[in-house]
């Protein structure tokens, strides 16, 4: 880490070049926004290298190291989600709708027995198919069910568990006094995340050369 100091006069540490990450990432034919995906992939992989260097080399408090684990997992899951999203869109398997909300009508409150009720009616018009939101759980299920990637089925189950940790990006979500970040992220989660990410990035559908991801095995 000393080489990263602005006062350092020696050779600086640099992550793997952006161009190498871009060139190494394979995407399915028909993937939309390939340039943006490759760019964001490269930037976030560089960031993971930097986070991993901090975790490996810095002497930090238990709170700070825990927060680095959290950041690493959030970024890594984001990379996987982007690749799964791109794959489903390329394969024309992304969730679509042919209806668009036109208007909503609401009634006034009415008495019904001992309750106060109101009705709300949504009116839709039929349109050409368009993409709608698809959550990460749905992406994982679709990728697995269709067998789009050369991955063991156990990878998907493990990924779902890690996905729950990614949801802790929402700081207000908790289930009790002890349900906080410090109690939810640890070195095992971090190691687990690296292994899963390595498996996904080196599968033949995404990878030209697995050697570039060797740092994930450290």
Feature map (PLM): residue ranges:
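Charge-enriched, short contiguous segments at helix-coil
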Residues: 141, 145-218
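Charged alpha-helical initiation segments
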Residues: 1-69
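Short, flexible helix-adjacent loops and helix caps
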Residues: 53-60, 88, 92, 174-178
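Short, contiguous, well-structured surface segments enriched in hydrophobic/aromatic residues
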Residues: 35-50, 80-89, 120-131
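Amphipathic alpha-helix face/heptad-repeat signature
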Residues: 37-40, 44, 75-76, 155-158, ...
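Amphipathic alpha-helices that form helix-helix packing interfaces
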Residues: 44, 48-51, 55, 76-80, ...
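Short, hydrophobic, well-ordered secondary-structure elements
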Residues: 66-92
